[in-house]
Curated annotation (Swiss-Prot):
The protein, known as: Pesticidal crystal protein Cry9Ca
Family: Belongs to the delta endotoxin family.
Any Pfam family hit: Endotoxin_M
CDD domains for this protein: delta_endotoxin_C
GO biological process annotation, one example: sporulation resulting in formation of a cellular spore
Function recorded in the entry: Promotes colloidosmotic lysis by binding to the midgut epithelial cells of Lepidoptera larvae. Has a fairly broad spectrum of activity against members of the Pyralidae, Plutellidae, Sphingidae and Noctuidae families. It was the first insecticidal crystal protein characterized with activity against cutworms. No activity is observed against some beetles, such as the Colorado potato beetle.
Amino acid sequence: MNRNNQNEYEIIDAPHCGCPSDDDVRYPLASDPNAALQNMNYKDYLQMTDEDYTDSYINPSLSISGRDAVQTALTVVGRILGALGVPFSGQIVSFYQFLLNTLWPVNDTAIWEAFMRQVEELVNQQITEFARNQALARLQGLGDSFNVYQRSLQNWLADRNDTRNLSVVRAQFIALDLDFVNAIPLFAVNGQQVPLLSVYAQAVNLHLLLLKDASLFGEGWGFTQGEISTYYDRQLELTAKYTNYCETWYNTGLDRLRGTNTESWLRYHQFRREMTLVVLDVVALFPYYDVRLYPTGSNPQLTREVYTDPIVFNPPANVGLCRRWGTNPYNTFSELENAFIRPPHLFDRLNSLTISSNRFPVSSNFMDYWSGHTLRRSYLNDSAVQEDSYGLITTTRATINPGVDGTNRIESTAVDFRSALIGIYGVNRASFVPGGLFNGTTSPANGGCRDLYDTNDELPPDESTGSSTHRLSHVTFFSFQTNQAGSIANAGSVPTYVWTRRDVDLNNTITPNRITQLPLVKASAPVSGTTVLKGPGFTGGGILRRTTNGTFGTLRVTVNSPLTQQYRLRVRFASTGNFSIRVLRGGVSIGDVRLGSTMNRGQELTYESFFTREFTTTGPFNPPFTFTQAQEILTVNAEGVSTGGEYYIDRIEIVPVNPAREAEEDLEAAKKAVASLFTRTRDGLQVNVTDYQVDQAANLVSCLSDEQYGHDKKMLLEAVRAAKRLSRERNLLQDPDFNTINSTEENGWKASNGVTISEGGPFFKGRALQLASARENYPTYIYQKVDASVLKPYTRYRLDGFVKSSQDLEIDLIHHHKVHLVKNVPDNLVSDTYSDGSCSGINRCDEQHQVDMQLDAEHHPMDCCEAAQTHEFSSYINTGDLNASVDQGIWVVLKVRTTDGYATLGNLELVEVGPLSGESLEREQRDNAKWNAELGRKRAEIDRVYLAAKQAINHLFVDYQDQQLNPEIGLAEINEASNLVESISGVYSDTLLQIPGINYEIYTELSDRLQQASYLYTSRNAVQNGDFNSGLDSWNTTMDASVQQDGNMHFLVLSHWDAQVSQQLRVNPNCKYVLRVTARKVGGGDGYVTIRDGAHHQETLTFNACDYDVNGTYVNDNSYITEEVVFYPETKHMWVEVSESEGSFYIDSIEFIETQE
C-alpha cells in the first residue's frame, strides 16, 4: 500500500511485503498453533512478538576494482548478476566486500579516476579541476564510510543479540545513507554531467544497494514498519530518478557525438559501447534490488548487443604510405551506422560463420583478404536456421564453429595493402577462440601495414574470475570502393564483431527456487504485427510492440524443476491504452490480466512508463499453473486493444509458488499491516496512518485462512476493527460515509447537482463519492466546514483520501490561507475481480492483491505533475491563532470545474497531525501576523464602505424598523445604496461562491435591508414593473420598443418616433401622487412621459437632448436625469404613456407614488 502525503513542501509515498525462509515453514504443525491464543485480547496479541512494525530509514552499497574502467564495470555487473540469482541476505557481507575491493582496490580512488578519464577521452571534454577534486574527495569518504558499515553489518550478523552491534550498524546505515544523499549531487555538476556519468552511475548503484538493506534487516535493527516502508519508497523513488538521469545524459552525450564522417562515427560507436558496459548495464539491474518484488532472487537477462570496433587498419597515425581508415574522406556517418549496426531483432545465437576469401593483386604482390561471410543463426530453442550473407561470397572459405559456449575472444589482423597508386583495407587473419582460424596469404609475407586487434582489449574478462563476459553473436560487414581514372583507387572490406553477454540463458530455463526472467525479445520466431524495438537503455535489451490484437511472441522454455511445481505470472509492460494479456502454455490458457494505460500517446518511454503486474492467482481464471513437460511453449497474446494505442512488453516473469510459505507470508503481512496502524502502546493510531490503510489492512486480515490461522485471524480482526473505530473518532469531518448530503444542519456536506454516492465497489470498502463533469459555468462540488471549536491553534491538520480516477479534480483546504491540489489520476486500477459467492459479489482478496501491485508501481512522485496522478493523497494545512473575531474553521472543498472533468474518491478524513514547532511554528506565526495585519487593514477599509452603505440605506427609511420607505427617495437612491453594498469585498470564498467570506455577515445584513427597501418601493409604486427588471411585463407596447440591460440596470428604449408604451393603473382618487421619471434623451426631438386619469386630467414630463443645468449642475446628453410632477387623480383608473418625437428615448424607471399631504 502506497501513501502520498502532499503539501506545499513534500510528497511522501509507501508500500510493503514480507518473506520468511523455507526453513521457517513447517507443515503439518507439530502442535496446535492456536492454543496459546485462547483468552487473549488483540493488544496482548500484537505485543506477543518482539518485532516492532512502526517506522524506518535505510541504505546499502556496492564497490568495484580492476585495471581500467570497462573491466571494472564488467566485473561489477557480473558479480551483481550472480548475487541476484539468490536471496541477498545470505551473501551480503561477502558481496559488499567484493564491491569495496573492486571500486577501492587499495583504499584509493584510482578506479574512480579511471571512470572519469574514460569518458573525458570519449567526449573530448575535461572535468574542471575543482569538480574532479571535490568528487574524488567525496568518493574516498564514501568508500571509507561503506567499509565501516560493511564491518558493522558483519559484526551484527554474527551476533544479532548484541545490543551494541545493533546500535552501531543501525547508526552506520543511517549515516551512510545521508553521505550518499549529500555526495550524489557532486557527481552531477552542471555542464559536466556527461564526463561524470560513469562515476554517477556506479555511485548511485551503491546507494540503491544500500537502501535495499532496510527491507532486509530493518526489523532486526529496530526500525518501525513505517520507517522501513519509507526507506523502501525512497529506494523506488531514487531508482526512477537515477535511471532517468543516466538514460537522459547517455543519450545527450551520444547525440553530441553524432557527426558526418568516419572519425565522428568511431567516437560515437565507442561511446555507445563503453557507456553501455559501464552505465546502462548497471542501470538495467536497479529494479532487481527490490527484495519485496524479488524475495527469492532472479536471473536478469541483459540481451542487448555491443559492437567492438571495426577490424580495419586504423592506428593512431599514418604509417608511411599507409593511411589510417579513420581519416578517410569517402565513408559517411550514416552509411557506416547502417552497415555495421543491425536493425532491432529478436535475440539469436550464432551456429556457424563461414568466411570467404578473395585475392587482391597490387602490381606483382597480392593479399588474400576476408571478402564476405555467411552466418547461420537460430532464435532460442528453435530448430529453424536463419542464414545471412555479407560482402563477396567466394569458393575459398573457412568455417568457424563456435560450439555450445560460443566464441569469446577473437584476435584479428587488419592490413592496409597499398602502393603509390592503389590501396586496399582488409583482414587477412582472424583467430576465433573457440571456433577456428581464418588465415589468408599475403605476398610478400610481410607486405602491407598491419594493425592487430584483440577483442579482450575492448571486452576484457571479468578480473575476479578471468572468465570472458561476452560471446560472439553476429558479424556485420562493410564494403566500399573508390575509383580514379577508371581504376580502383581505394577499397575496403571491413567486418565488425557483435557480442552478447555470456550469462544470457540460451535455453530460457525455468527453475523452482527463483523468479525466471523471460524477455520477450527471446521469442522463438518473429510474428506478423509485432515490431522489435531497441529498448531504452534501462531495459537491458530490446522490447516488443503491437498496435493490434494478436500474438506478441512465442517463448520456448526448458523446465528444470518437478512438473508438480506451481508458478504464477508477472509481466512488465508499457501502454498508451487499456488492453489484456493472455498467456498460453501449449495452446492452453494459464493466465490473463487486464492492464491499464501507463503513458500518454506520443510520450517517450521512460522508467515510469513501465509497470510490473501480476496475473492474479486467487480466482478461477488465473489459478497457479504447472508445466506438463520439460520443453514447453508459452505464447503471449494481446487482446482488447484500443485503436490507435501502442502496447509494449519488456518481459514475462515466472514466479515459483510455495503455498505453505505464502500462507505464512500472508499472515506475517497481515500482522505487519495491522500492527503498523498502531502506536507502540497500541492505544492509538500512528499519525501517518490513513483511513484507506485501515481498510486495506482489514482486507488482508479477511483473506487469511480460517482453518490454518483461525485464532490469529480473530485477534487481528479485533485489532483492525479497533483501528477503524479510532480512525473514525479522530476524523474531524462530519458524516465521512456521506449518509446525508445537503441536510438542514449548519455543518455537514453541502453539494451541487452531479454528486452521487456509490456503495462499496472493488476499490472501496465503504462508500465512495462521484463527481460528474461541470455544466458550462456551473461546477460540480461538495464541501464541508470543520468548525473552529474542534481545532487547536498553531496545529497541523491533514486531509487524506483515495482517488480511483479523476480529471481536473480540485481539492482545497481553506483556513486563513488556501492549500490547492489538482488530481488527474489515470483510470488504471483495472479490476479483474470475480464474485466470491457473497452478497457483495466482490472477491476482496483478489482485488486487494491487484490494487496493491498497481499502487506499488506508482513509485514516489518526482514532481507535482506526477503527484497529481497518484491514487492516494494527503494535503496539509496549518492553523494560526484562531482569532476569535473571525470564524476560522477549515473548509474542505472538492470540485470539478471543467466539462470533461470527473472524479471517484473515498476514505476522506481530516485528522490532527500535531502542534507546530521550530521553524514551522515560526513561519506560521509570521504568516498569521501578516494575515491579521492584512485583515485589520481590510476591515478598516470595509468599515468605511459599510458605514457609507448603512447611512445610505438608513436614508431609504423613515423608521428604525425599516417598515416605511422615505417618500422622497426613488429607485436611483436604492440603486446607489445597492452599489455601495456590492462594493464590499470578501463576501464569498474565491474557491466557491457557496462558501461565505469574512464579510459575509455584514453583507447579508445590508442586503436584507436593501431587499426590504426594494419590496417597499415596489409595493408603493402604482406602476407595475416600473424598473423594467421584468422586461416589458405589464406594459402595452408597439414595435421599436424594447428593454435593454447594462450590468444590473434595465431600461426601456424607444428607438423610433412612432413607438409607444403604456400601462393602465389603479389608484386612490383625490389623493396626492408624485410622478417621478428617470430617463435620458438621445438625438433630436423630445421624449414624453404622460400621466392622465379618466376625467381627462393629465401631466407630461418632457426630456430632450439639449444641454441644460439642473439645480446649477451641468448635465450632458449621456446622463440620466430625474424629473417629477405632482398629480391628484379624480378617478381610480389612470394611464401612463411613453412616447417621443424623434431620436431615441431611454427610461430607467417610472414611479407613481402616493404621498402624504
